[in-house]
């Protein structure tokens, strides 16, 4: 029988962003903590190996090695998938004996009600151990997605207060208002502490990340997922005109990681589309740049993670998308503008003329 081990906390991470946030919070809180990685991102084994070297967490567990749970989730037939997951629920102690056997935690940090969060909480309840559920920042979803903001009622007591660590409590409160059932706490800026920066540099090998030298960045999108063919053509032509106006050599294109098209052949394409934008914010002088995007919420990151204020130009009002906006885009970007010290640096043109007028004005400022 395994000896019981009690620790302050454990973190569940599914994305590189969550991993960076977990490192930031673990160092800030100074707790004795473990981390469990649900490896759904590229090169996860490399990141996990480097994470162990940082010493931030006492124990780093790759949940991908819990092959039964991973295989069940990956079954394509939804009925068979549901059956396989149900069988794991029925044998939850056996399913997680290897990863969790003997371990108890005062707190379980998660960014959302994820698959492995649900399974781990089922395990803890089965062995009569109920950790306090604490949410930590997952980017845009933590501010406007209920799945990332509201804990599953099965795992919190009826009258409990949900603790949430966020990079921008100000933005959260502007988006959602105050709630006496929530305890919103600030998560320090990602590079506030040398230990955090050193750990992130090691995990992601930031010295090898190409620096963006161009003054303008375009965060491109997967056109076929959000536009019809005609709109996609109009969108591309607009961006080509932007590049022509600014000068091709002054523009860096960051393609979507899944975009294999040759749309930008002959332009300055960022050499590794899989590099998280958050890391570019850390390694490049992003506050001195102009960033253009259709509606990528990645543009929130310079401000909320690092306190930097690049010029942001959002184009979503110029093009009709397949999924109609329910007002959510306007809400989050207008509130992002409200937390900028210089609100004129968040631009949302409603016409082509307005877009190119913005670019003319920015060109005049740079020429001074």
Positions of PLM-derived features:
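Short, charged/polar "capping" segments at the starts of alpha-helices
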Residues: 41-49, 117-119, 142-145, 225-227, ...
């Amino acid at each position: 029988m395994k000896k019981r081990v009690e620790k302050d906390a454990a973190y569940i991470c599914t994305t590189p962003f969550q991993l960076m946030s977990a490192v930031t919070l673990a160092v800030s809180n100074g707790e004795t903590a473990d981390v469990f990685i649900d490896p759904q991102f590229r090169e996860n084994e490399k990141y996990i190996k480097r994470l162990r070297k940082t010493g931030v967490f006492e124990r780093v567990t790759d949940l991908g090695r819990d092959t039964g749970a991973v295989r069940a989730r990956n079954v394509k037939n939804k009925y068979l998938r549901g059956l396989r997951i149900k069988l794991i629920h029925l044998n939850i102690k056996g399913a997680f004996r290897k990863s969790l056997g003997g371990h108890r935690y005062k707190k379980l940090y998660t960014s959302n009600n994820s698959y492995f969060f649900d399974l781990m909480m089922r395990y803890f309840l089965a062995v009569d151990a109920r950790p306090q559920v604490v949410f930590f920042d997952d980017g845009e979803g933590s501010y406007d997605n209920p799945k990332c903001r509201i804990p599953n009622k099965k795992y919190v007591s009826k009258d409990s207060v949900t603790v949430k660590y966020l990079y921008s409590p100000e933005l959260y409160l502007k988006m959602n208002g105050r709630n006496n059932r929530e305890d919103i706490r600030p998560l320090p800026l990602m590079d506030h502490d040398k230990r955090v920066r050193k750990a992130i540099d090691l995990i992601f090998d930031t010295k090898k990340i190409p620096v963006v030298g161009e003054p303008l960045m375009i965060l491109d999108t997967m056109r076929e997922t959000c536009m019809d063919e005609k709109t996609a053509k109009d969108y591309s032509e607009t961006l080509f005109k932007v590049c022509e106006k600014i000068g091709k050599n002054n523009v860096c294109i960051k393609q979507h990681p899944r975009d294999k098209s040759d749309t930008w052949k002959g332009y300055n394409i960022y050499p590794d589309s899989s590099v998280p934008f958050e890391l570019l914010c850390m390694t490049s002088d992003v506050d001195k740049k102009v960033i253009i995007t259709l509606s990528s919420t990645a543009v929130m990151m310079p401000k909320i993670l690092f306190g930097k204020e690049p010029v942001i130009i959002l184009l979503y009002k110029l093009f009709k998308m397949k999924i109609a906006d329910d007002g959510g885009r306007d809400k989050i970007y207008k509130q992002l503008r409200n937390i900028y010290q210089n609100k004129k640096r968040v631009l949302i043109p409603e016409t082509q003329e307005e877009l190119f007028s913005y670019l003319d004005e920015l060109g005049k400022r740079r020429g001074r």
